[in-house]
């Protein structure tokens, strides 16, 4: 996600008395008995440290560490990550934007920034959590842009960044997962969020992303050590399901001994009109009922397609981002959504990561669950619903 508004935390939890977690029964699919599928199963459910290390600025910062809390308003603490683990989350997705913190032709990352990222990563590793580390909001023409004109530039940037990250985190075991890039897309075009495979520029973008992903795998594997066998995640165009379901998307090749260690990354805030669209926009809806097909159909169809193309063919899938924004206190619908989404994902053999941007007030993308100021769960019933079906 790209929402940048910093919101103030309220002092008390949202009242959720009278809200019930629905009973959801989805017949589980046959999941291949492979190490990769078991690995994703063990990731259980994850939580995104959103609007934090992924924050970016157009201004020069004397203290670039302050960017960490410039969007979310709070510096990350061990107490926060401990609370995430205690709630039952087993994976931390750690989105990081790097371009405000690099210098020189080889994009040398600021030691202070890299140290701070590692410090927070260690909070989760010390809690025996999985951590997904990525390149996040570096998706523009100066850094990573998926067209042929910028292909060489993009490959250069990603190579130098991933060489440094692979070196810094190479001694960590498989609990640390590398994700090539976040939501690669044609920024500021009509196709930014709408992939049209009849458009030449979209086909070209998909082909460039294929090259990025292959280069990412090659660069990481080449560094050896634990990186030679580390689990790696790769997205398609804008990390959408369509981005990996179209015929032009190609999964990177890997060494024979690493079969099943490339994880397909998908972001899916669906159904869109409920989960992501602003409440003030036309066609936005604020109701979701886990027992009604009209609510669940988009989720069912996406899961089925991902299962058919990937899971059934022993290729693991991770939903790197999902969630439903608060729309004027529609808590019961969000609880229904959380329960159904996770129940479906687990039945189809996938793990999911809720996008939490610490946003609770205003008219922006209100995906916050953990109030980072008070380190309390503002919507414990949503968390309970996620955990009930994540096993």
Please state what every model-predicted region is:
Residues 11-91, 309:
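N-terminal carbohydrate-binding accessory modules
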Residues 22-25, 329-391:
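Aromatic-rich peripheral "rim/lid" segments of glycoside hydrolase catalytic domains that contact
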Residues 27-28, 71-92, 102, 106-137, ...:
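An active-site-proximal structural segment forming one wall of the substrate-binding cleft
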Residues 49-76, 104-109, 150, 273-299, ...:
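Acidic/histidine-rich helix-loop elements
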Residues 58-66, 98-115, 139-154, 186-201, ...:
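Surface-exposed, active-site-proximal loop segments in enzymatic domains
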Residues 68-85, 158-160, 299-306, 335-338, ...:
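Short, acidic/polar
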Residues 155-293, 304-324, 347-350:
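Active-site region of glycoside hydrolase catalytic domains
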